[in-house]
Every structure is written in structure tokens, then in C-alpha cells.
Amino acid sequence: MKELAKQYDPSQVEDRIYQFWQDGGYFHTEADPDKKPYTIVMPPPNVTGQLHMGHALDNTMQDVLIRTKRMQGYAALWVPGTDHASIATEAKVVEAMRAEGLTKEMVGRDGFLERAWDWKTKYGNRIVSQLKKLGTSCDWQRERFTMDEGCSDAVKEVFVHLYDKGLIYRGNRMVNWCPHCNTSISDAEVEYEEKGGNFWHLLYPVKETGEMLELATTRPETMLGDTAVAINGEDPRYAHLHGCHVVLPLLNKEIPIVCDEHADMTKGTGVVKITPAHDPNDFEVGLRHDLPIVRVFTYDGHMTGAADKAAADALFAAGKNTVNEPEVLDCGKYAGMTTLEARKAILADLKEGGFLKEIEPLKHEVGTCYRCHSTIEPMVSKQWFVKMEPLAKPAIESVEKGEIKFVPERFTKNYLNWMKGTRDWCISRQLWWGHQIPAFYCDDCGETVVAKEMPCTCPKCGGSHFTQDPDTLDTWFSSALWPFSTLGWPNEDSADLKYFYPTNTLVTGYDIIGFWVSRMIFSGLAYTGKAPFDTVCIHGIVRDSQGRKMSKSLGNGIDPLEVIAQYGADALRFMLLDGSTPGNDMRYSEKKVEAARNFANKLWNATRFVLMNLPEDFQPGLPEESKLDMSDKWVLTKLNQVAGAMTDNLDHFEMGLAAAKINSFIWDVYCDWFIEIAKPRLNSGNAEQADTARRVLVYVLDKALKLLHPFMPFITEELYQALPGSAETIMTQSWPTFDEAHNWAEEEEAFEKVMDYIKAVRTMRTEMNVHPAKKTSMIIETADPAPFRNAEVYLAKFAFATDVTFTEKYEGSTDGMVQVSTHTARGFIPMMELIDREKELARLNKEKAKAEKELAMFENQLANPKFVERAPAALVEEIRAKRTNSQSKLANIEQSIKALG
């Protein structure tokens, strides 16, 4: 038998155990016709990222599921991988180049990509090694990257397929533009923050009447791009202005007054300025009224100037402009200013000209980039889009029919709301790192050819020279294909794809249901004809101890690797799961980590005790039932119940409940009770009794380690290998299940009667400060003495009884006796010679006063007819039960006071 160290040191165990698992190939899975598959694909963390608490929670949950299914006999595959993270990675590389005095343009696209791949190689393995520290049992032989050859092939296949079906198109549309990242981003990537601002009330003169039209805007710098003012056609206040014009202040330019329902008669003055190039609603108004689209911002957040206008004019002159192509304004004195600088200058000029009426402070939601948190500029830009309506419909139906379930179910609504409200998806990004769009433009005639590879001949003019579109695809485009691109698609003959797809469970946070979950669902249905998974298990975020979101700005982030270094990975994993509930946020608690570490130490010490009491020739296995005593059947029944309950919990993704159950069983049932109960038999001198106790101790420990293994894999592996008769690894052992043969309900109930009585006696002795060495006789009054008679050895050991008398009704003298009561027994214990009488009387009188106050409170509640009539019936019954308990408690205290004279 393996000898365990005196104390558990995770730093001496975890790396060695993980290497043992990897060397043994225990994480690797192949298609097996004799087994059912169970597949999880890891949400790929950013290749430049590092492990944070969200990763730790997400991957611990996945590991619990995959380890459990592996032990349940499934061909359990967990596919790991990383995401190329276009925006984040490009920003990192650009920042590193800036430190060298270089820009992207200086080194060129090829030079930049070479640096980006070097960066990926240097930092890409960091988060993988950190995930291994956590104990993740991924099939690392199948590790994937969203820009590896297989994923790239899948991306091209999908793009060409969608384009050929008319579901991908290129056009000038309103997009969310990040001036810092210098790229468009999708609606899902815009985060909204409440910020302070103003409504600036401006006055626009009407050309035909000379009157002033008042309107309000939060962005006065956009007024240079106004191409109309809108009123509601039903608004009687402005009926006389139909067909009129206003003169745009500062530019002295005539623009029309249009009638459009976008102008709400009930809000403000009912007049709105229309800037089609820089507002999504205004863009739609512009399309309805065929208004010019005039861009006044550059892509890096400055006001446009003469050079910008000249470039745009040249495009129009050459006939290369496309539908909805924006004109560009030379903003004159404001050209080159940042948008905020221009705002100040424009407002000053408006005020000077008498066009600024008033300023109204307000709080409003401002769109920001999810990566850099810069303010998003709505911008009309030529981009690639996916038509969402045809793809969204089957994805909505699949969830509504129950083919895909969300856990908790409430997140189904989030998903459906997102899918039903989604607009066409802008998939092009003005970046170099990522999947370059497989669209090629003929250098001779400008024809667009979409193909997986560079075409040889132009189908329109026969030319042979092409330029590939410089933009890359949204990172989420490739991530949307992750469940099947990682399993061999588009090769539909792939053995892995046939066996492991569709996958089973997706574990992810609620914050990326729109970003990622929705896109995987419609992609799986569109390209494979199957939903990519059947269950989406949603978890919350890990907050700090005060309930705040962890962030760099608050400085409240907790590094999981530091926690692992101090407490071990098992302690961190258990803290994250114990008591957690699906879909809800949780708080990081160092006290809970310490408690998990203490739990590991408790288990270690218990295992050492068991091993130290085994002879060299010990052979594991339960003895025949006739040799089991009441306590053996009790602990085996408890183990059986826990195995059944945990299996049910895990089937329903209630990992927190499952963790709490095995914690309670090992600590409370096995360590605090059964080991202590076994000691008298181990030391009894009776070889058969000692052997039975040993066998039950080892059997229960073996099963408990297996139940705990998915949650705390390192310590359970180390302890399991120390048990006599253990196999090579706990990972591949069978998961314990409910066994009717080990369900002794009567013995369980009987033994718990004894336990309750022992607990009551020990509590009483503790309260009365009686030393454990002081023992006394006792009389037990009970209608069912059999369990107590069968447990006299335990009453002597744990209730400190010298001898026990049993009676159905005790009618003797109670002088000098203290009473203890449970729901099935009452004990009369002579305590006078063991205690300080005066001190005990003082304590009892204090307890009596407390009990009387408690009873009075319950009686007052029940004496109030309004409470009894209006309160929920269950609450009234609960108060009545508490009153009854208080009455019984008070009676026992009074009896004890009387006994002490």
C-alpha cells in the first residue's frame, strides 16, 4: 500500500498527477461503437488571454460533466482550443510595434501577420498551460485554433456557400464603428453605458417663412451632415411647412423639411434633424426620402477635410461609387478636429449666431466598444453582411420545439428575444489579423468573385489579375462553426463528425448568448442540418466578496493561479461549485476557499487513519450482510442515497447541490460519525468485528472518492491510488449509482434515533461544561428501545454512559437529574456530582428567560387574527410548529431547574 505524507500539500501532488494523466492518455477519446458519445466543445478562450475567475468557473463546470460521463461509461470527448480574437490580438501586436516605433503600414500586411503569428506562438500556450493547472481533462491531442487549417477551410466553405445562396452581400449600410480599434463591430459587440450628457436645443430658420424651428440633439457635431429636418405629417403645428426648407446654420445650406413618422409629435417639439450618415434611424429616413448621405467624420474620429472630400469625389467621378455611397463634406474650419473638439467649437459658433436656445442636462445610454470601451460612432460604410432572417427562423423554431434546452429555462427568453430582434450581421472587420474575406476583385473590370481560392480567370472579362478583399471576418464568424469545424466538417465523411456530432452540452455565460450561442445554433442548423448541441448550461459571473464585477479599474480581480498556488486547484474548484446555482452570479470568498482546503485536509487525514488501521494482507470488499451492524448499514444507506441524489443533480446540471451533498457526506457522515463509530470495533480485540469495520471503511471511502473525483480530481486520484486493490486511475472507474441492495431504511432510521440522542447528550454536557472523562448512568425513556439496546457500546463511548436502563415510561424520582429529549426518546441523567450546581442553575434560568421570550413572540403572532387570516397558510403552520417546539423546550428547561432543586 502507498504511504501518504503526514500532511496534504497540493504543490507536491497536482503537477505530478496531471502529468500522470497525460502520459497515460486518459483524456483521449476515440469513436467507440460499444459506447454512447458525450461531447463538449470548450468555449475557446482568447489566444492572448490569461486565466481569470470566469474561465475557472466555466471550465470547472465542464470538467465535472466530462469526468462524470467518462466514469459513467460514455466515450466522453472534451475538445479544447483557443480563439484568434481579431480585435484583441491585433491591438496587442500594434501596441508592441508602437513601442518599437513601428506601425502596421510601415511593415505591410505580410510583415504584420508574421509578427501576429509570432505573438500567437509566444503567448498562445499560456492560457492552455493555465487551464491544465486547473485540472481540465480535455483531449489535448485534439486541441484546435480558430485559424488553424481545418477551421480556415470551414470558414471559406461557409462564406462561399452563403454568398452563392444570396445570404451574404456587400453594401453601404449603417454600422457600429469603433474609432479606436478602427473597425466596424456587430450590434452584439456594442455595450451600453449610462453617461451624463445634454440635449442642446438648436434653432433652424425656415427659408420660406422666416420662423425658427426648434429641435434638440445630443450630438451637435453631426449637424454639419444634416440633409433634412423631419416633422410628422399628422402634426397640425407644422402643416403649413409641408414642402418647405430650412437653412442649415453655420453652412448656410438649404435642406428640405420632410414628413416622416420617425418624428414623434409627443416628444419635445416634434422636430428632428436628419443625419443619414451618422444615425441608424436617420439612415432609414434618408432611404425613404432619397436624401443625400453626407459623412462628416473620419474613421479615426476626426472631422473630415478637403483631402477626404477629394478622395470621395474621385470615386464618384470614376463611377466606382455604389448604392448608398456617402458623400464627404469638407468641414472647413472644423476639419481635423476630434469630434469632441468640434462639438465645443460648433456650439460656440451656434451660440454666437443665435442658433443655440438652451442646454438641457440628461442621462442617456451611450454605445461603447466591448473591447476598448470607446464611444461607438454610427457610420455608413461599405461592409459585408449576413442576411439573418432566413437563418434565424429555423434557429428560433429549434428552441421553441424543445430540440435545444437552456438551463435555467429562463434564458430561453433571452435567446428568443435576441434572435427575433436581430438585424443583418455585419461580418467584415477592417483588421489584418483574422480570416481574410474570400472575395476577389478583378483588377481589369472590378468584377467580384467569391471563391475558396484565388481565381485564375475573371468570368466577366477574362482577366487574370485579382486583388483579395483586405478586410477580415468578425471573430464570431469562425467561432460560430466551432462545434462542427473542430470535428472535421466540411468533410462529412469524418469519423469524428459522424460519431461525436451533434455535441451534447454547451457550458457558457449568459453574457454571450447573443454573441456566440445564437450564431452556433443557426450555423449548425444551416450547414449540418442538425442543432449543434441539445443543452445550453448557463452560469453567472464570479463577483468579488462585495458583489462587484471584477475589473482592472476597481483593482478587485482575483488571479486563479495565485489561489491555486496558495490553496491548490481542488480547493478553488470546490469553492466555485459548492452552493452555486445555474445561471446565477456568485461571489468569490477566500473563506470558502479555506473551507474547501480544510475539507481536503479532513479527507486526507481520514484516509491516512483508515490506511494506518489496515493489515498488510488486507483484502477489500464488503463482508456478507449478516456481519454488518446497524452503523454499517446506516453509512452504506447514506452513501447509496448520496450516489443517487448526486447523479440526479448532475443530470440536471445542479453541480452546486451535488458538491454540497458529497461534502456533507464525507465530513459529517463519514469523518465525524462513522470513523468515530468504527474505532471501538477496530480496537475491540474481536477480529471479525474489526475486519468488518475495516472493510466498510475502505468500501465507503472508495465510493466517496469516486463521487468527489469530478469536483476535486487531484486529491481523489492521489488517495484512490493509495487504497488497497485500486486500479491504475480513478478516472476510468465506474461512477457509483443507487443500489437497492444497499438501501436499509429501517436500520438507517433506527441508528439515527440513537445518533439524535447522543447529539442531545453531548450538547447538554458541553453546555454544562462537563469533562469527557466524567461518566454517569442514564435512564432512557422510549417506546422503541431496540435501537438503543443494539447501540449500547456507542452510548457508552459517545454519550459517556456507565450503564443504561430502558423504560417505556419513567415514573421515578427526577431529583438531581437533567433531562435531554429527542423526538423519539427522553433521557434522565444524574448530573449533580458532575457539575457546579449554582453555575448550572444560573445558565438554565438564563435559557428559561430566553425561551419564554421566544414563546411569547410566537403566541402574540398567533393571537393576532389579522396575521392568521392574511398570512400564507404555510407560514401560519410554521409559526404554530415553532410555538410547540418552544413550549417543549421551556418545559424541559423547567424540569431541569426543578431537578437541580
Question: Language-model segments: which ranges?
Answer:
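N-terminal, positively charged nucleic-acid-binding surface of large information/translation enzymes
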Residues: 1-234, 275-288, 292-311, 343, ...
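Feature 926 captures the class I aminoacyl-tRNA synthetase adenylation module centered on the KMSKS loop
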Residues: 201, 417-477, 481, 526-569, ...
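Secondary-structure transition/capping motifs at alpha-helix termini
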Residues: 67-75, 96-109, 129, 133-138, ...
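Structured ligand/cofactor/substrate-binding pocket environments in proteins
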Residues: 54-66, 73, 82-83, 151-154, ...
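Short hydrophobic beta-strand segments
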Residues: 37-43, 49, 273-274, 443-445, ...
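Short Cys/His-rich metal-coordination motifs, predominantly Zn2+-binding knuckles/fingers
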Residues: 181, 251, 372, 443-445, ...
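Residues forming anionic-ligand binding surfaces in small-molecule and nucleic-acid pockets
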Residues: 391-409, 497-499, 853
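Active-site-adjacent bridging/hinge elements
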Residues: 34-42, 64, 100-103, 128-135, ...
